[in-house]
Amino acid sequence: MKTVYIVAGLFVMLVQGSWQHAPQDTEENARSFPASQTEPLEDPDQINEDKRHSQGTFTSDYSKYLDSRRAQDFVQWLMNTKRNRNNIAKRHDEFERHAEGTFTSDVSSYLEGQAAKEFIAWLVKGRGRRDFPEEVAIAEELGRRHADGSFSDEMNTILDNLATRDFINWLIQTKITDKK
């Protein structure tokens, strides 16, 4: 047990000694000394100044290393995200469309297109007069709900529908005259 304590004590003294007498290999450390490297240093302030400089250099270098490491990690994360986006997110986009409301909008557009085609076919066939009771239409417009649960009581929509119906009634009732 004594030998372990002795070895630990020698190790601590060795480490402490190496911290106090750092080798001056680089030009930066050599420039910080006013005396030449061969002359012994007798001023304790100069030793402390050297120690502070080497600690600051280590801290600065370590900070630069950590910054570059964070940048590398971030770039790696971006690359992995992009790589995963191509495989997984395409399946997720189909479900996301409905959540965004574009799917509902596409269905509404399709249904409106179908109604327009049916109406044009009805006009071309020229079958009987179709009446549009306006009181029922207004009540129907006010009571209709959208997929998100909100009422469609916007006056612009109602007025546009009424104007369209009036125009269609005018077209149906007007006689076509041929000018030759």
Curated annotation (Swiss-Prot):
Gene giving rise to this polypeptide: Gcg
Tissue distribution: Glucagon is secreted in the A cells of the islets of Langerhans. GLP-1, GLP-2, oxyntomodulin and glicentin are secreted from enteroendocrine cells throughout the gastrointestinal tract.
Region of interest: Disordered: 23-59
Major location category of this protein: secreted
PTMs per UniProt: Proglucagon is post-translationally processed in a tissue-specific manner in pancreatic A cells and intestinal L cells. In pancreatic A cells, the major bioactive hormone is glucagon cleaved by PCSK2/PC2. In the intestinal L cells PCSK1/PC1 liberates GLP-1, GLP-2, glicentin and oxyntomodulin. GLP-1 is further N-terminally truncated by post-translational processing in the intestinal L cells resulting in GLP-1(7-37) GLP-1-(7-36)amide. The C-terminal amidation is neither important for the metabolism of GLP-1 nor for its effects on the endocrine pancreas.
Protein's recorded name: Pro-glucagon
Signal peptide region: 1-20
Domain of life: Eukaryota
Keyword hit for Secreted: yes
GO molecular-function term, one example from the UniProt record: receptor ligand activity
Induction: Glucagon release is stimulated by hypoglycemia and inhibited by hyperglycemia, insulin, and somatostatin. GLP-1 and GLP-2 are induced in response to nutrient ingestion.
Proregion span(s): 84-89, 131-145
Any one biological process term the GO annotation gives: adenylate cyclase-activating G protein-coupled receptor signaling pathway
Residue(s) carrying Phosphoserine: S54, S105, S108, S150, S152
Site (Cleavage): R52, H53, R83, N84, R91, H92, R97, H98, R130, D131, R145, H146
Arginine amide: residues bearing it: R127
Role noted for this protein: Oxyntomodulin significantly reduces food intake.
SMART domains according to UniProt: GLUCA
Family per similarity comment: Belongs to the glucagon family.
